[in-house]
Amino acid sequence: MIGISYLYHGTIDKYAADIIYNGVNLLKSKNHLDFGRGFYTTPDKQFAIETAKTRARAYNAFNKDNPVNPKVLVFECDDSRFAALTQKNFIIADALWAQFVLSNRCERQDVHEQYDNNLDSRYDVVSGPTADGRGTLTPIIHQLDTGECSIEDVNYTAFAPAKHWGKQISFHTNKALACIRLKRVL
């Protein structure tokens, strides 16, 4: 049970339309995200708005002839159905959270075998802090993937979220997605 009535997903209008007309398709999610391949939401409306704006700016920087607009999808939660799901919840950005994020994001098999991850969607839902995308995480992942460092060498506070970054709740199975329903678009 997550105890939240509404969740928000910040995106761009073309992807929002796809979700509105076809539903969430987990296969369209990118690999190597914080909590593994999944559909990412947040209980923080403002964080979702900022995410949508950031995604629109990034898309438009490379597609000036066909610009997109930010959109936020609002989902209602059926909290009674969450109890039947396999869940992992991180309250704070501590060492276990960092190892989980790094194991999901890097490509090294030995890291996947040594540390908990969600590459196989063993968790229906994962919640916790959003890793800071200020450019600190990508070099760390590169160092892990090339063997320049081990997870034990990583200072996880380097990519721990800033105070203003929101919590994320990710859905990794269709069973989990059945617990949320699209209500409106902002």
Predicted regions and their residues:
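Conserved NAD+-utilizing ADP-ribose enzyme module
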Residues: M1-G3, H32-F35, I49, T54-L186
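Glycine-rich loop/turn
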Residues: I2-Y40, Q46-R57
